[in-house]
């Protein structure tokens, strides 16, 4: 099957596929319509010459390379493409003699498919060799990083730095060139992010090594902390480089990124459970411990973390952990209620406390078992991935020693571990059967090699068979590991709501549990938010969570009994939909308030830690103050991370922002203990310049990361809501200050005034970011003016607060302070108003009917229609434009003979134009009728401004019936999104609706419904045309959008569409060559279908996201823009 994960491969395969599509159509015309196939001798001869050149250059490459895998994998690809070319030549010769020959048509279609598949195999094999070159450089850096452990002198450090620099530069250059070549945006982003992290960590590594060498050589205190800093940095850089190596080897969408994240999440949950257990047990043992104190909160946190772990499990494990959490939560509520009534020492309460204590131990054991299983399966999977390269190298080398056999045995051992942990017997048996086959084949190959027959045809065939079996075994183990994990809901709130809504609308359809998983995720986040709230607010949010939980369970129960469409189910679905809206609104309100509180000041704790670390050695209580501030800093960092995660989970962020928040939270958790270690080194070595510089490096890295986190959190929540919450919080702080003055409490006053100043500065930061993000001059001026006014009010308030604190009983000073506080409130209100959307100016009301009267004059007659005029003819469609082969840029490394030969094949395919003049002329001379309109560009003659919104053709897509065809399901998903809006005056919506209909048609064609090869190929072309229209219009909207962030999001989404639509055309051609053929294996046909399905789903999703981003961008369109789109909801949101 063709793969096109690089731009070069895609650009070569596209014209080849385009011409093969014409051969497919010719074949079908001859087979179905009985038409003669024109003489193809000339174009086939040109392709034969290009293929021969490609093979010749490939063989020369094989002879000169030292890459054993390339030497092994190239020859089969040569044979494949040469055989296909031979069939094409044979077909051309037979058709020249008999244009109606049936065997010739068979050779034509099989040869066409083989040319495309064989060329793809050649390019992929060569590309894999290029990737191995990059990986070798990466592994060289990995090995050199371990040398950091033996650097103990400054001379060694200087040498190490000089040697590391060039290698890092080379790796960075190769990674940058590679990411530009990739077609998958996700892979590009992963490579860039990991490489940027490595670059950022390089100065940290040098700093950590320097302080280690300094402390060791001077025998100073803090050598253990220095060692931790160095080892942490080495491990972090190694992990990122290993991630680069993993991503480099991906040729399809990455579906395995969950493994390390889930393992980390479970370990973090277990660590937190362990840290809170003593506090929780202490509260349970003390019958007089009050409800709601730290001990009860510890129990809630344990249950919360265990619930997170349970959500990462599947099947029986999941049910047991979540069920235990729920039961213990209810028992804790009952115990708290008994103690609140003064009955904590009664036998019933004591028994309840003991049961909860035992239940916590049982719950912890279940989470530990789940974590061990996940880690074991993940480790085995990763071990197989690491060992398979060495095994393949051994198989490729006819003279390889026994060490390669050990690698194969190691792979089999890890696969056996996965099989033992499988819950599904069929999967387990399948893996074990593969292990038996590989063992027998490997023993046979080893025997041949021991007898000096390793280079014999039999041994080579065995090696190839084992290599294929190992790849299949890896796929089976990967699938088995993935199947032990639960279905994943979307990572952001809107995605979860959409998934939940789809299930609520159609609970009888099998969505693999995604909809219910989304609802569970929303409820879990709601309960996590409730845990940090107090009093009636907590109970209110928990009640909303319970309500959603109950309704979802009732609907699922009815669906399981086959009553998902009953009136009772419809009523419950409506209630569930309303309850979800209520829960979402309450969650976002609670989250915004928490962000306003926790992120009002992000850097003061680390600054106080720096002051404590640099305090003179004779400062009283120096150690105690440092430890207190270090603990405060760690708690503060933990709160920031937890709040940021909540903002990501229930905010309005898109997937990119959510993943960005998660990455910064992870970095903050890793960096925080390293900052404390660096501070402790400085504390124990006062005046040490190296220690000071190292602490500053770590501190600045932590601050930069938190600033990035803060910006992403601000993106994730509505700015207006954040400003409202901040304004309300300032009012409460001002009220506290009034109470403090009334009670003569200067410390309380200072705390309140400090909080007001921090919140005001936070508002200034938010406003500044929004000004930088906008290109709307009016908005920028309004926000900047309001921000400047607010900025001027903060210092006077602080000065007045200090004056009152010095003489708190002075009424005049109190009045001055309150006036300053009210001025800040007024300025904050003006900033908020600057973000308020302008209300439209409504026209004046119509006059009273009493004052209206009708005249006796008749309306003027209707003008006559023009006579004798004929509408102008429709202009001819534009010629298909072939993609140019990407020009080689100066300094690029892709100048190998292999690529030059591929370029020649590309050029030959282009010469064989989509409407070949020679073929048409020869056909015309032979009296053959060729319909040129078959290849005409599709024309959408119905402009969107006159399109009827009823759109009866959409009724072809049943929306309330179970859909088990993934392409049709993807089309319906886009269709639902597009039909929210009227297509009148909105070409993006019109094009999206056409794409949905075309994709529904493709679903029928791919699954063997009505239609033929030509219809499938034409359908893919039509989809590509509509895709180009969506992309063009989206870029026009982006160009006029004044919001930089929204514009970037829109461009990132829509730029994926052309690549995916091009791939759709190629895959449709491949699938068309298989329709109706009996010499195609079921496995090969299914593989082609799976690739086409995956591509179609990605295209529909990208267009759907483009529609959403375009609507958001249209709100921020330039007022003087000539380009406008009407966004009119068919069903308003308030209905």
From Swiss-Prot:
It is found in: Cell membrane; Cell junction, Adherens junction; Cell junction, Focal adhesion; Cytoplasm, Cytoskeleton. It comes from the Eukaryota. Keywords: Actin-binding, Cell adhesion, Cell junction, Cell membrane, Cell projection, Cytoplasm, Cytoskeleton, Lipoprotein, Membrane, Myristate, Palmitate, Phosphoprotein, Repeat. PROSITE patterns: VINCULIN_1, VINCULIN_2. Residues 2-835 are annotated as: N-terminal globular head. Gene3D superfamilies: Alpha-catenin/vinculin-like (1.20.120.230), Vinculin, Vh2 four-helix bundle (1.20.120.810). GO terms for biological process: adherens junction assembly; apical junction assembly; axon extension; cell adhesion; epithelial cell-cell adhesion; lamellipodium assembly; morphogenesis of an epithelium; protein localization to cell surface. Residues 837-888 are annotated as: Disordered. InterPro entries: Alpha-catenin/vinculin-like_sf, Vinculin, Vinculin/catenin, Vinculin_CS. Residues 259-589 are annotated as: 3 X 112 AA tandem repeats. One of its GO terms (cellular component) is fascia adherens. Changing residue 100 to F: Some reduction of phosphorylation levels in platelets. Little change in cell spreading. Complete loss of phosphorylation. No change in subcellular location nor on in vitro actin binding. 40% decrease in cell spreading. The modification Phosphotyrosine is found at residues 100, 537, 822, 1134. Changing residue 692 to F: No change of phosphorylation levels in platelets. Isoform Metavinculin is muscle-specific. Residues 836-878 are annotated as: Linker (Pro-rich). Residues 1004-1047, 1121-1135 are annotated as: Facilitates phospholipid membrane insertion. Exists in at least two conformations. When in the closed, 'inactive' conformation, extensive interactions between the head and tail domains prevent detectable binding to most of its ligands. It takes on an 'active' conformation after cooperative and simultaneous binding of two different ligands. This activation involves displacement of the head-tail interactions and leads to a significant accumulation of ternary complexes. The active form then binds a number of proteins that have both signaling and structural roles that are essential for cell adhesion. Exhibits self-association properties. Interacts with APBB1IP, NRAP and TLN1. Interacts with CTNNB1 and this interaction is necessary for its localization to the cell-cell junctions and for its function in regulating cell surface expression of E-cadherin. Belongs to the vinculin/alpha-catenin family. This is Vinculin. The gene is VCL.
């Amino acid at each position: 099957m063709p793969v096109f994960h690089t731009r070069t491969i895609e650009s070569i395969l596209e014209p080849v596929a385009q011409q093969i599509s014409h051969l497919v159509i010719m074949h079908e015309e001859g087979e179905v319509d009985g038409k003669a196939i024109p003489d193809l001798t000339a174009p086939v001869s040109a392709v034969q010459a290009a293929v021969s050149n490609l093979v010749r250059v490939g063989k020369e490459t094989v002879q000169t390379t030292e890459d054993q895998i390339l030497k092994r994998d190239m020859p089969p690809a040569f044979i494949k493409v040469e055989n296909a070319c031979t069939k094409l030549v044979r077909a051309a010769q037979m058709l020249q003699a008999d244009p109606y020959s049936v065997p010739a048509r068979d050779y034509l279609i099989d040869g066409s498919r083989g040319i495309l598949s064989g060329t793809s195999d050649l390019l992929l094999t060569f590309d894999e060799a290029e990737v191995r070159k990059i990986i070798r450089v990466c592994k060289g850096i990995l090995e050199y990083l371990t040398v950091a452990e033996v650097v103990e002198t400054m001379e060694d450090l200087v040498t190490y730095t000089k040697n590391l620099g060039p290698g890092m530069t080379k790796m960075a250059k190769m990674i940058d060139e590679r990411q530009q070549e990739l077609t998958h945006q996700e892979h590009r982003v992963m490579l860039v992010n990991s490489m940027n992290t490595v670059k950022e960590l390089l100065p940290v590594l040098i700093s950590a090594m320097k302080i280690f060498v300094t402390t060791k050589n001077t025998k100073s205190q803090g050598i253990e902390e220095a060692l931790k800093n160095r080892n942490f940095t080495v491990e972090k850089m190694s992990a990122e480089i290993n991630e680069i190596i993993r991503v480099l080897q991906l040729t399809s969408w990455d579906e395995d990124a969950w493994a390390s994240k889930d393992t980390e999440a479970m370990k973090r949950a277990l660590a937190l459970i362990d840290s809170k257990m003593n506090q929780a047990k202490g509260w349970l043992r003390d019958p007089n411990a009050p409800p709601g104190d730290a001990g009860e909160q510890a129990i809630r946190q344990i249950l919360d973390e265990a619930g997170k772990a349970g959500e990462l499990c599947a099947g029986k494990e999941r049910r047991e952990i979540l069920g235990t959490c729920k039961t213990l939560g209810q028992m804790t509520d009952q115990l708290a209620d008994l103690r609140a009534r003064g009955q904590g020492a009664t036998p019933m309460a004591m028994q309840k406390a003991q049961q909860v204590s035992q239940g916590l131990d049982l719950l912890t054991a279940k989470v530990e078992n789940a974590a061990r299983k996940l880690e074991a399966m993940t480790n085995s999977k990763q071990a197989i991935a690491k060992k398979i390269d060495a095994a393949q190298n051994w198989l490729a080398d006819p003279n390889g020693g026994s060490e390669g056999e050990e690698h194969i045995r190691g792979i089999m051992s890890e696969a056996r571990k996965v099989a033992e942990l499988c819950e599904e017997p069929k999967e387990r048996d399948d893996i074990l059967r593969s292990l038996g086959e590989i063992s027998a084949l490997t023993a046979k190959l080893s025997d041949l090699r021991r007898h000096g027959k390793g280079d014999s045809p039999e041994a080579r065939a065995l090696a190839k068979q084992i290599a294929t079996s190992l790849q299949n075994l890896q796929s089976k183990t990967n699938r088995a590991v993935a199947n032990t994990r639960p279905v994943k809901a979307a990572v952001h709130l809107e995605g979860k709501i959409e998934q939940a809504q789809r299930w609520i609308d159609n609970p009888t359809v099998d969505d693999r549990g995604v909809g219910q998983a989304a609802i569970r995720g929303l409820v879990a986040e709601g309960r996590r938010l409730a845990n940090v709230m107090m009093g009636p607010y907590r109970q209110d949010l928990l009640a909303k969570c319970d309500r959603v939980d109950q309704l979802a369970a009732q609907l699922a129960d009815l669906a399981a009994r086959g009553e998902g469409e009953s009136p009772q189910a419809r009523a419950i679905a409506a209630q569930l939909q309303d309850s979800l809206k209520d829960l979402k609104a309450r969650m976002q309100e609670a989250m915004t308030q928490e962000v306003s509180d926790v992120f009002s000041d992000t850097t003061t704790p680390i600054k106080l830690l720096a002051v404590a670390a640099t305090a003179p050695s004779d400062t009283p209580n120096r150690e105690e103050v440092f430890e207190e501030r270090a603990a405060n800093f760690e708690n503060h960092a933990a709160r920031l991370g937890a709040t940021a995660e909540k903002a990501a989970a229930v905010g309005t962020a898109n997937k990119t922002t959510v993943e960005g928040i998660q990455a910064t939270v992870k970095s903050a958790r890793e960096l925080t203990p390293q900052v404390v270690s660096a501070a402790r080194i400085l504390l124990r070595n006062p005046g040490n310049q190296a220690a000071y510089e190292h602490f500053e490096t770590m501190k600045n890295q932590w601050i930069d990361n938190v600033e990035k986190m803060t910006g992403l959190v601000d993106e994730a929540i509505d700015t207006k809501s954040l400003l409202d919450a901040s304004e309300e919080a300032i009012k409460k702080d001002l009220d506290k200050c009034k109470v403090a003055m009334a009670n003569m409490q200067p410390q309380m006053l200072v705390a309140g005034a400090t909080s007001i100043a921090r919140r005001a500065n936070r508002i200034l930061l938010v406003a500044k970011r929004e000004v930088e993000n906008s290109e709307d001059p009016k908005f920028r001026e309004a926000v900047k003016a309001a921000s400047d006014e607010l900025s001027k009010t903060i210092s006077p308030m602080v000065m007045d607060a200090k004056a009152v604190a010095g003489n708190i009983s002075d009424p005049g000073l109190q009045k001055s302070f309150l006036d300053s506080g009210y001025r800040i409130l007024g300025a904050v209100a003006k900033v908020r108003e600057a973000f308020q959307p302008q209300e439209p100016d409504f026209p004046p009301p119509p006059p009273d009917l009493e004052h209206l009267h009708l005249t006796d004059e008749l309306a003027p007659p209707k003008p006559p229609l023009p006579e004798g005029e004929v509408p102008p003819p429709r202009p001819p469609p534009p010629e298909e434009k072939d993609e140019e082969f990407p020009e080689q840029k100066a300094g690029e490394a892709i100048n190998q003979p292999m690529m030059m030969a591929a370029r020649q094949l590309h050029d030959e395919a282009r010469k064989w134009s989509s409407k070949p003049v020679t073929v048409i002329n020869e056909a015309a001379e032979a009296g053959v009728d060729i319909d040129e309109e078959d290849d005409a560009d599709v024309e959408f003659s119905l402009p969107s401004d006159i399109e009827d919104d009823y759109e009866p053709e959409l009724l072809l897509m049943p929306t309330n019936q179970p859909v088990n065809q993934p392409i049709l399901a993807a089309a319906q998903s886009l269709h639902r999104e597009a039909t929210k809006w009227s297509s009148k005056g909105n070409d993006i919506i019109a094009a999206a609706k056409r794409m949905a209909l075309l994709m529904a048609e493709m679903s029928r064609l791919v699954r063997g419904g009505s239609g033929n090869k030509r219809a499938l190929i034409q359908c893919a072309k039509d989809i590509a045309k509509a895709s180009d229209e969506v992309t063009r219009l989206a870029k026009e909207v982006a160009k006029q959008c004044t919001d930089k962030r929204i514009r970037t999001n829109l461009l990132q989404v829509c730029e994926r569409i052309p690549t995916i639509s091009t791939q759709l055309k190629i895959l449709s051609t491949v699938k068309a060559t298989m329709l109706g053929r009996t010499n195609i294996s079921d496995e090969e046909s299914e593989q082609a279908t799976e690739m086409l399905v995956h591509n179609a789903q990605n295209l529909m999703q990208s267009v759907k996201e483009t529609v959403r981003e375009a609507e958001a961008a249209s709100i921020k369109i330039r007022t003087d823009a000539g380009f406008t789109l009407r966004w009119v909801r068919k069903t308003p949101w308030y209905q």
